[in-house]
């Protein structure tokens, strides 16, 4: 997880200071990639900013919750719109609403920006909105 990487950088730095016989290197590569690499035995520790799917949970996998993550939707400050409903967000991300005027804003196209496919933050956001996506 790239969103967990900053916290892990600090924890790894402190661990490395007091455990000179070992070394932890942190790489934020995305939640799905981190989980997959642990399950395949490529790495010993992985980071995820989302819950694991049933297919990702292995017998030998230990999951330790270290924090809760927050999600926010932001709109450019020049946009006069002050709020969106969950249904409007759903329809924007599904491509059904493509212009701000359809949700009370100016007559301008909506440019949706999101995280990469393997992002745990994106997965959590899509799950909360009810958007479906298959993760291998």
Question: What is the predicted role of each segment?
Answer:
Residues 1-136:
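Flexible loop/hinge segments at secondary-structure junctions
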């Amino acid at each position: 997880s790239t969103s967990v990487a900053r916290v892990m950088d600090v924890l790894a730095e402190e661990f490395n200071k007091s455990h000179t016989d070992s070394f932890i290197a942190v790489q934020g590569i995305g939640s799905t990639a981190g989980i997959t690499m642990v399950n395949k035995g490529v790495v010993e520790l992985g980071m995820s900013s989302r819950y694991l799917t049933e297919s990702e949970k292995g017998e030998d996998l230990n999951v330790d919750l270290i924090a809760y993550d927050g999600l926010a939707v932001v709109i450019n400050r020049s946009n006069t719109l002050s709020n969106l409903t969950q249904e409007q967000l759903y329809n924007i991300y599904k491509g059904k609403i493509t212009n701000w005027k359809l949700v009370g804003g100016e007559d301008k196209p909506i440019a949706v920006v999101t995280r990469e496919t393997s992002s745990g933050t994106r997965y959590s956001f899509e799950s909360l909105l009810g958007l479906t996506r298959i993760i291998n």
